[in-house]
């Protein structure tokens, strides 16, 4: 029996096509994935992300524990509400999950992890927390709605109270703040401005309806995937997993090497990999007809005339750009051109940084 979010009936009211997503009944689309995608790029769309796992880490050792658990360093967080993206690694430097951590106080942090990895993550966090003065509490009674797009903040403001709007006024990107019963964060998975709103389950349906009434378009997993890929954001299980280290997943910027005595889990293995050199995650652009897809092989010849092979991790048609884009893991000697094998022939592609669209505009 699949899990259902508190908004399941609201999806049915909007004629959603429901699919199983890692054990959750979730909307794939509400009729047109392209229209939903474009709404987020041009106006405002919203996603039910209540399947995500919210975990509060509280206690005298909360900071010390998270500094060991995560490859990024929560000690960098000094301003209440500031958020940090990073990886949780195993001893071999494989990525157990990527997650966002919000700093509330020195003894209170909120972590949001992926739904597909929930049980694995919670077990790992519980195991690693032994010996630390921390309490790790999952918050299943909280739903989450992501409102994204150039008009998302204005439309969200119309459904928030005066006090809630005052609480989040002027909030910078990548922050979260408690505003009455809501936890409102300037984060997202689309490359657009907006909010991710953590809301008590008993208020979630009314909030969803209020946003609908403001003209915010409901969007499903299909549009969520094309939007995040245009924004060059990783999807766990495709672009990285426990067999992949963060240096090979365009997550090098999320590793806090300093201070050098911070012994986070996976550090020694990661230092060895760093010194030896790893593959890297790049962007591919194909302006010919056709669509780049997961698992297609990528070929290139280096400056010494040696052929190398990589693989596409995520690929799609980009509605914003009008042609296909992909992320691919390849040897780091790649230049600015390559070939992808599709339909038994090789097609030329451009190699770019894995970031295709930001704020509705081409980013490469």
Curated annotation (Swiss-Prot):
Keywords from UniProt, A to Z, are: Aminotransferase, Transferase
Supply one GO molecular-function term: transaminase activity
Biological process terms from the Gene Ontology for this record are: glycine decarboxylation via glycine cleavage system
Please indicate if the UniProt record lists Transferase as a keyword. yes
The cellular component terms of Gene Ontology attached to this UniProt record, alphabetical and capped at eight, are: cytosol; glycine cleavage complex
What's its catalytic activity? N(6)-[(R)-S(8)-aminomethyldihydrolipoyl]-L-lysyl-[protein] + (6S)-5,6,7,8-tetrahydrofolate = N(6)-[(R)-dihydrolipoyl]-L-lysyl-[protein] + (6R)-5,10-methylene-5,6,7,8-tetrahydrofolate + NH4(+)
Return the EC number: 2.1.2.10
The record ties this protein, via SUPFAM superfamilies, to:
Aminomethyltransferase beta-barrel domain, Folate-binding domain
Q: Which Pfam families match?
A: GCV_T (PF01571), GCV_T_C (PF08669)
- Lineage top rank: taxon: Bacteria
**Tagged with keyword Repeat:** no
Its biological purpose is as follows: The glycine cleavage system catalyzes the degradation of glycine.
Family, per entry? Belongs to the GcvT family.
HAMAP family with a match to the protein in the record: GcvT
* Subunit-level organization: The glycine cleavage system is composed of four proteins: P, T, L and H.
> Protein name, please?
Aminomethyltransferase
Species? Shewanella baltica (strain OS195)
């Amino acid at each position: 029996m699949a899990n259902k979010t508190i908004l399941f009936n609201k999806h049915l009211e909007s004629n959603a096509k429901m699919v199983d997503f890692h054990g959750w009944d979730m909307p794939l689309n509400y009729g047109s994935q392209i229209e939903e995608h474009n709404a987020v790029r041009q106006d405002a769309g919203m996603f039910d992300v209540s399947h995500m796992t919210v975990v509060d880490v509280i206690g005298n050792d909360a900071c010390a524990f998270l500094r060991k658990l995560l490859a990024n360093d929560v000690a960098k967080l000094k301003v209440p509400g500031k958020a940090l993206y990073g990886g949780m690694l195993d001893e071999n430097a494989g990525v157990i999950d990527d997650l966002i951590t919000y700093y509330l106080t020195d003894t209170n942090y909120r972590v949001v992890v992926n739904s597909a990895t929930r049980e694995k993550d919670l077990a790992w966090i519980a195991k690693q927390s032994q010996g630390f003065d921390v309490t790790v509490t999952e918050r299943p009674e909280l739903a989450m709605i992501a409102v994204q797009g150039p008009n998302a903040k204005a439309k969200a403001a119309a459904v928030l109270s005066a006090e809630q709007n005052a609480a989040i006024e002027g909030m910078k990107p990548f922050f979260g703040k408690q505003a009455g019963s809501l936890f409102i964060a300037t984060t997202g998975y689309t490359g657009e401005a907006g909010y991710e709103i953590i809301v008590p389950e008993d208020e979630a349906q009314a909030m969803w309806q209020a946003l609908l009434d403001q003209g915010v378009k409901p969007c499903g997993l299909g549009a969520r995937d094309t939007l995040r890929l245009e924004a060059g954001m990783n999807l766990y299980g495709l672009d990285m997993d426990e067999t992949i280290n963060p240096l090979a997943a365009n997550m090098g910027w999320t590793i806090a090497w300093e201070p050098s005595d911070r012994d986070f889990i996976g550090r020694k293995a990661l230092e060895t990999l760093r010194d030896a050199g790893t593959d890297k995650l790049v962007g591919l652009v194909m302006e010919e007809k056709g669509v780049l897809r997961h698992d297609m092989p990528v070929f290139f010849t280096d400056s010494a005339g040696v052929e190398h092979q990589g693989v596409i991790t995520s690929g799609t048609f980009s509605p914003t750009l009008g042609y296909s884009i992909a992320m691919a893991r390849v040897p780091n000697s790649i230049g600015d051109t390559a070939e992808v094998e599709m339909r038994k022939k090789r097609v030329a592609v451009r190699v770019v940084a894995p970031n295709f669209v930001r704020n509705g505009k081409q980013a490469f």
